[in-house]
A protein has these predicted regions:
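Trp/Phe/Arg-rich N-terminal binding region typifying the photolyase-homology
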Residues: 1-176, 281, 352, 371-376, ...
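Active-site-proximal binding-pocket segments
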Residues: 27, 91, 247-446, 450
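Alpha-helical packing segments of well-folded alpha/beta enzyme cores
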Residues: 36, 75, 79, 226-233, ...
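Charge-dense, low-complexity intrinsically disordered segments
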Residues: 66, 70, 217-220, 224, ...
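Short secondary-structure transition/capping segments
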Residues: 93-109, 131-143, 182-197, 408-414, ...
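Repeat-unit-sized solenoid/scaffold elements
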Residues: 116-132, 364, 445-458
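Glycine/tryptophan-enriched, flexible segments
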Residues: 146-312, 438-469
């Protein structure tokens, strides 16, 4: 069922007499539990027209590189296959997404688009809505409770949002049934050059993107791989999640954040799967999946400066400014941080984990961000450095969750703590706390092993390595 609160008409134009209904897929790169896709199918059937799914592949998406594109194309290749199985044609074009959407809209009776929350995604949808000749309808499918339903303003913390979401959760946590298209569109010919992604290496080679950040061997894109990880998490990790999720030397997290970032798996699908499990620890995981993740969507939607130092609350800005004059024992350049060349072996291990795997343990992400603040000339420089490294190397970089996570390291969605040098009233973390709580030697050994394995895996062995989920 698709509730009306998920649906928003973006312009005041009408459905017109054109040959197709078009779904512009952008943030929700999946065929399962995709409200935008199911809405588009429903409208196509009602209008007795075939459905076309369009995806625009640009060389110029901000800060994206080979690592991100490879993972995304692995997922899109699977999407195209699954859509064909459902008799739906998918057109992938090498073009700026909004321009391609506008071009194909000239053939559309109706345009449907999934919802995005970042600045560029909202700009793209506005451009299409303003310039398309037909009605443009946006369907919200990458959160459980729609952002504007959950709250009409930027929330101060998880505490202030949690109750608001809880009150509406049952209303929106409804199963979504797949519909069949009445019209088969797979053999339709449209006057557009399609971008072939069957051979992903070849497709990547033809893109003018940053190829210095290579694909990772530890995660393979696509809904099917996300579902394998989810089943493994539920079966083998969830029962110890609360106890062990913060232990860097162990892997009791779900590994689903890259898949959620690219919309390759639905948070609603995850929630419904967990509702069938009678494990107490699921509450802790659902706090991360729903409250924390949707708090990040609230942050980037309501705060125009979400990727800037100025997004921080006034108390954090004031206290960090007050402590600008404090002496820093260590100051590292961007190059030293990027290459994990600090005096702190724990921090270096976390940075190397990000470089090698495209992910970083959640608890270490907090420590990582706090230390960048401590080791930079100014907190604003630290903020920009953290954003740069996060977006460049993490598979889930450039994500609302990442922007909120970095902001948290500097005081966002947190409260003032005891005052100390450099940090002021911002929460402090140090290596002694890590050593006291966790098996950090084992964590460092784990990352060293990853580095060694990554170095010796040949191209011929990649397929085998990727199957070891």
């Amino acid at each position: 069922m698709i509730l009306q609160d998920r649906i928003k008409v973006l312009n005041n134009k009408k459905t017109i007499d054109n040959p197709y209904v078009v779904y512009w897929m952008q943030c929700s790169q999946r065929t399962e539990y995709n409200h935008a896709l199911e809405y588009a199918i429903m409208q196509a059937n009602e209008l007795k027209k075939p459905l076309i799914v369009y995806f625009g592949l640009t060389d110029n998406y901000p800060e994206a590189n080979e690592r991100h594109y490879y993972f995304m194309l692995e997922g899109l290749k699977e999407v195209k296959t699954e859509l064909a199985r459902r008799n739906i044609k998918m057109i992938i074009r090498k073009i700026s997404p909004e321009n391609g959407a506008l071009e194909i809209s000239s053939f559309a009776a109706l345009m449907v688009v999934d919802r995005g929350y970042l600045r560029i995604e909202r700009k793209w949808r506005t451009l299409l809505a303003q310039n398309a000749k037909c009605s443009v309808v946006q369907v919200e499918t990458n959160v459980i409770v729609p952002v504007e339903v959950a709250s009409i303003k930027e929330e101060y913390s998880a505490y202030t949002l949690r109750n608001k979401i809880s009150k509406r959760l049952e209303e929106f946590a409804l199963p979504l049934n797949e519909r069949e298209c009445d019209e088969d569109s797979t053999n339709l010919e449209l006057p557009f050059d399609e971008y072939d992604i069957e051979d992903i290496d070849k497709a990547i080679s033809q893109l003018k993107i940053d190829k210095t950040v290579k694909r990772v061997l530890y995660y393979k894109g696509g809904t099917s791989n996300a579902k394998i990880l989810l089943e493994e998490f539920i079966s083998n990790k969830l029962s110890h999640y609360s106890e062990l999720k913060n232990e860097p030397s162990k892997t009791y997290f779900s590994d689903l954040s890259p898949y959620l970032h690219f919309g390759q798996i639905s948070p609603l699908y995850i929630y419904i799967k967990l509702m069938d499990v009678s494990i107490e620890d699921k509450k802790a995981f659902l706090e991360e999946l729903i409250t924390r993740r949707e708090l990040s969507m609230n942050f980037v939607f309501y705060n125009d400066k979400y990727d800037c130092y100025e997004s921080l609350p006034s108390w954090a800005l004031n206290t960090l400014d007050k402590h600008l004059v404090d002496e820093r024992e260590f100051i590292y350049s961007l190059q030293e941080l990027e290459t994990a060349q600090t005096h702190d072996d724990y921090w270096n291990a976390a940075q190397n984990e990000m470089l090698i795997t495209g992910k970083m343990h959640g608890y270490m992400r907090m420590y990582w961000g706090k230390k960048i603040l401590e080791w930079s000339k100014t907190p604003k420089e630290a903020y920009n450095t953290a954003i740069y490294l996060n977006n460049k190397y993490l598979l889930d970089g450039r994500d609302a969750n990442g922007f909120a996570g970095i902001a948290w390291c500097f005081g966002k969605h947190d409260r003032p703590w005891g005052e100390r040098a450099i940090f002021g009233l911002v929460r402090f973390m140090n290596d002694k706390g890590l050593k006291r709580k966790f098996d950090m030697e084992r964590y460092m050994h784990k990352i060293e092993s990853m580095s060694y394995n990554s170095a010796i895996i040949s191209d011929n062995e990649k397929t085998e390595q990727l199957s070891l989920f």
